[in-house]
Amino acid sequence: MVVKHVMDAAKKEGADHKILTTGSHDAKKNPLTPEQKVKHLSRAVKGSHVEAMTKEHPTLLHQMSKLHKAGYTHVTMHVGSDRVHEFHKLLHQYNGTENKHGHYNFKSIKVKSVGGERKEGGGGIESASGTAMRKHVTAGDKESFHKMAPSGMSKAHKDELYHDVRKGMGVNESFIVRFKNWIS
């Protein structure tokens, strides 16, 4: 799980960690509210420091300015392997510049991959993605959703997360039946 990976990497370096979730919320790609994202991630991994992006600091660049203002001089960001180059370029492009996001000037910025390549279709945490988990919710496949959820989560917590995603997507039983009939 990404959160555990970040916590372990920070501990190894003797550094603080912060998990940032997007502040966006919509039925299609972000069915959980920012508050629900923080609640579920914090409960899933004890000791994690999870925050949602806010109206005051809505983007990654705003968050970098906030960290710089708080006195941090080095930043290491952990992302999926497919996003390393993109974030490396973005963060370095604005380092030392004043812009609408504010200002940051870190001595070092590292962007690292969280583990290896994602294993599509594996069914477990290695193949977990928000897209795949939302598909399981749409199909009413709670068992597959549970397999992709962090192993440290209790069944009750996985059920609560499943319900929250389902509600956020506007999925109800009649929709699931129609969807299953459509794909059959």
Describe each PLM feature range.
Residues M1-I183:
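Nucleotidyltransferase catalytic core that binds NTPs
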